[in-house]
Swiss-Prot record:
Domains (record comment): Consists of three domains; the N-terminal catalytic domain, the editing domain and the C-terminal C-Ala domain. The editing domain removes incorrectly charged amino acids, while the C-Ala domain, along with tRNA(Ala), serves as a bridge to cooperatively bring together the editing and aminoacylation centers thus stimulating deacylation of misacylated tRNAs.
Source species of the chain: Coxiella burnetii (strain RSA 331 / Henzerling II)
SMART domains on file: tRNA_SAD
Protein name: Alanine--tRNA ligase
Catalytic activity: tRNA(Ala) + L-alanine + ATP = L-alanyl-tRNA(Ala) + AMP + diphosphate
GO molecular function: alanine-tRNA ligase activity; aminoacyl-tRNA deacylase activity; ATP binding; tRNA binding; zinc ion binding
Subcellular location per the Swiss-Prot or TrEMBL entry: Cytoplasm
Length: 865
């Protein structure tokens, strides 16, 4: 049975048992900042298990893509070296939310393994938690398994909990016995660490709630969470012990063998590469882009590790991206998102490979050099950090190399170096956090800026130089915290508001607004008078907010327009919304064509002309999802979110400020489109009067150009094309004339050559030629003279141009850069180039003749050395 058949068999079995087939969730956990990646099937059901979310079903079955690289669960450094460690795997799971419990869960699992998959019971081994007598009784008395293939284990192995407090419970595990030819004892024995017995299914029974004191209290509705690794189960079904021998990996290994022109399918580097293409492709399809932090950094590490192993196999050109196609052939049917994202995956990987190529070469040279001189077989932490910080060499890549060469890593030293850098970095970010902490003693700030741009308020806290104060005097800078404010704090790409706080006999200029928790920080300067804690003020936001609102609303229209023109896989990756412009970053593998840009711009302006009504509703994140609202991927939202709808065109979760109707945006104009990272494009645009000013300026430039070229705008492109074509023809003619001039001067110059021993030498100034002509003459003289050293000079627009050439048979004595350097120095300039050809320039024409005259003596001196 192959892996595709196993997936289908598993889902169909539980579907017949009234389980809802739930698609696997993204590798990026939604609304859960505690997890870097989805690492188990239960992750998407966590809130259901916790009782904070309800689903229309009580039984579920899923196949969940999982990652074990980065964060608490990290298998990266073991991948390729063992039979079962992977960065990416698929977890088969069935779940009960207060429906069936231990008896049915055990019965379903045993029936599926022994009756559906026909696994012999004598090859299976079962474990239970030592105090879970109920599960033990079900296995031994009801399922009637062999007591000799059963063991009790402690809390470490057979008791599961999500965290220190909350839902938890015992688990029972089913192992497969690969036979006595493989070392290792049964679970629970002293020899249990061997590879003979492999866990294939874990059944978790959530029946308790652990309180803060550690007490286990029974849950009102016990639940079941099970997980079974597809790769391990496939190995069992295909009669192999090593996961890399199953169909999933063999297909990729054969494709890699063809790509690298090698016959070795069991090479560790080959295994690393085929494992890594799976995790890399799924991460990119889920919207992760290589970067230097968070999930993007994990992705970058995995790509670079694969590239390094390709380098070990002699592959120095980009190759890793070419495994995308065979991966899609093997897994694209089960995961359609992979197929939709093929171009993005290939482009992102290829760009990262190219970018890392030079880094890898430099890093390996440095590491080789340093390791050769180490007094012990430990790589110092500061070297690991230097490679990481300066050359982008991930520590686990250095660890790979250390492992291969029998070195150990000084992780403690590396951690210290990282901590020093972290402390330096944190100092720059501490300002706002410190202020917020000290300001919070005055209470929270109520934001009223959605409804109004001015309001009355009370001062609840003042801060200056990182300290709370009672009074802020004239001309002093500081931070004012109010009990209510119309000022929008920087968030979601929208810049913080500016404006004024007015009070009796004075005013405070707000230059920026930031937010920490529920505290709004009005950062600025006292223009007049003084302000005390508890004073009353009138807070007024600057009218530039209207421009910000226009740009923010236009950003939403742009996002939806991009999705409609380029496809729904386009995802927002960042934005900046300020009064003068907007910037929007989004996932896309290649530059937009002029036609695509025009289509996007036209679609946005159509919505502006339609004057769509903007409506805002407050609802739960779950309700927003059902409504089809777009959300920032991986963003953590609170219990309630604001959903902005612009007619029936755009629906997004957003906490920013917006126009009431799209017509208030006025006009939308894209001014640039560029790449800002691998797989990420950036659009900058203008709205309203700024867009109109831009268009009018462009119109004026076109008018000026038309007048200059004496043609109308309709024929402007054709006229310019003709001018450029004429220019190209003239350049060709000029090049021919220069070549002819060089040839004509050749005989005259040869007559001025002097012999310095056996080296034919010429150092002379030419008139009315440029540097390119000098080079052409030098090349021709070298061919004619045999063994020669030549220096030619000219003065072009008051600046000396120098070219020196040396034939190869002179290089044992000196080269062209050495020959030209003293001449360039004498004329107040610099020079450089190759051993056989050098160029230079200078600013002192009065010294040129003497400098050239000294060339024969310089050569003679060199010949005597």
């Amino acid at each position: 049975m192959n892996s595709n058949q196993l997936r289908e068999t598993f889902l169909n079995y539980f579907k017949q048992l009234d389980h809802e087939v739930v698609p696997g969730s993204s590798l990026i956990p939604e609304n859960d900042p505690t997890l870097l990646f989805t690492n188990a099937g239960m992750v998407q059901f966590k809130d259901v298990f916790l009782g904070v979310e309800t689903r229309p079903y009580q039984r579920a079955v899923s196949i969940q893509p999982c990652m074990r690289a980065g964060g608490k669960h990290n298998d990266l450094e073991n991948v390729g070296y063992t039979a079962r460690h992977h960065t990416f795997f698929e977890m088969l799971g069935n779940f009960s939310f207060g429906d069936y419990f231990k008896r049915d869960a055990i019965k379903f699992a045993w029936d599926f393994l022994t009756n559906v998959l026909k696994l012999p019971p004598q090859r299976l081994w079962v474990t239970v938690f030592q105090d879970d007598f109920e599960s033990e009784s079900i296995w031994l008395k009801e399922m009637k398994i062999n007591p000799e293939r059963f063991s009790r284990c402690g809390e470490k192995d057979n008791f599961w909990q999500m965290r220190d407090t909350g839902p938890c419970g015992p688990c029972t595990e089913i192992f497969y016995d690969h036979g006595p030819t493989i070392s290792g004892g049964p679970p629970g024995s002293a020899e249990a660490d061997g590879d003979r017995y492999v866990e294939i299914w874990n059944l978790v029974f959530m029946q308790y709630n652990r309180d803060a004191k550690g007490n286990l209290l029974p849950l009102a509705k016990p639940s079941v969470d099970t997980g079974m690794g597809l790769e391990r189960l496939t190995a069992v079904m295909q009669g192999v012990h090593d996961n890399y021998d199953i169909d999933l990996f063999q297909y990729l290994l054969k494709a890699l063998r063809t790509l690298l022109k090698t016959e070795d399918l069991h090479n560790t580097s080959m295994r690393v590469i085929v494992d890594h293409i799976r995790s890399v492709a799924f991460l990119i399809a889920d919207g992760v882009i290589p970067s230097n932090e968070g999930r993007g950094y994990v992705l970058r590490r995995i790509i670079r590790r694969a590239v390094r192993h390709g380098y070990k196999l002699g592959q120095e050109e980009p190759f890793f991206y070419q495994l995308t196609k065979p991966l899609l052939e093997e897994m694209g049917g089960a995961y359609p998102l992979l197929r939709k994202s093929q171009a993005l995956i290939e482009q992102t990987i290829k760009q990262e490979e190219i970018q890392f190529s030079n880094t890898l070469t430099k890093g390996l040279k440095i590491l080789d050099h340093e390791m050769a001189g180490l007094p012990s077989r430990q790589i110092p932490g500061n070297l690991i950090f230097q490679l990481y910080d300066t050359y982008g060499f991930p520590p686990d890549l250095t660890a790979d190399i250390a492992r291969e060469r029998d070195f150990v890593m000084d992780y403690a030293g590396f951690d210290k170096a990282m901590e020093r850098q972290r402390e330096q970095s944190q100092q720059a970010h501490q300002f706002v956090a410190n202020y917020a902490q000290k300001a919070s003693i005055g209470g929270e700030t109520q934001f009223v800026g959605y409804e109004t741009l001015n309001s009355q308020a009370n001062v609840i806290s003042l801060l200056q130089n990182d300290q709370p104060i009672n009074r802020l005097n004239e001309s002093e800078k500081g931070v004012v915290v109010l009990d209510r404010t119309p000022f929008y704090a920087e968030s979601g790409g929208q810049v913080g508001d500016q404006g004024f706080l007015y009070f009796e006999k004075g005013s405070f200029r707000v230059k920026d607004t930031k937010k920490q928790g529920d505290i709004y920080l009005h950062i600025g300067e006292m223009l007049q008078g003084h302000l005390n804690v508890k004073d009353k003020v009138r807070a007024e936001v600057d009218v530039s907010r209207f421009d910000i609102m226009r740009n923010h609303s236009a950003t939403h229209l742009l996002h939806e327009a991009l999705r409609r023109v380029l496809g729904e896989r386009v995802m927002q990756k960042g934005s900046l919304v300020e009064a003068k412009r907007l910037r929007f970053d989004f996932s896309h593998a290649k530059p937009l064509t002029p036609e695509e840009l025009q289509a996007v711009e036209r679609l946005v302006n159509q919505q502006i002309q339609a004057n769509l009504l903007s409506t805002i509703e407050v609802m739960t994140p779950e309700e927003a999802k059902k409504k089809g609202a777009l959300a920032l991927f991986g963003e953590r939202y609170g219990k309630e979110v604001r959903v902005l709808e612009m007619g029936d065109f755009s629906t997004e979760i957003c906490g920013g400020t917006h126009t009431e109707r799209t017509g208030e945006i006025g006009l939308f104009k894209i001014v640039s489109e560029s790449g800002c990272a691998a797989g990420i494009r950036r659009i900058e645009a203008l709205t309203g009067k700024a867009a109109l000013d831009y268009i009018e300026s462009a119109e004026q430039q076109l008018r000026s150009l038309s007048d200059l070229l004496k043609t109308n705008r309709k024929n402007l492109a054709a006229k310019l094309s003709q001018i450029l074509e004429d220019h190209r023809k003239l350049e060709k003619e000029l090049a021919k004339l220069k070549q002819r001039l060089a040839s004509q001067q050749l005989e005259s110059l040869i007559n001025q050559v002097v012999d310095v021993h056996d080296i034919r030498t010429l150092a002379i100034r030419l008139e009315a030629v440029d540097r390119e002509t000098l080079r052409a003459i030098v090349d021709q003289l070298k061919q004619k003279l045999g063994k020669a050293a030549i220096v030619l000079a000219t003065i072009e627009e008051g600046r000396i141009q120098l070219v020196a050439g040396v034939t190869k048979n002179c290089l044992e004595h000196f080269n062209a850069t050495e020959l030209l350097a003293p001449i360039a120095e004498k004329v107040g300039g610099r020079s450089g180039g190759r051993p056989d050809l050098a160029q230079g320039a200078g600013e002192r024409p009065e010294n040129l003749e003497a400098a050239l005259a000294a060339v024969p003596k310089w050569i003679e001196k060199k010949l005597k050395e």
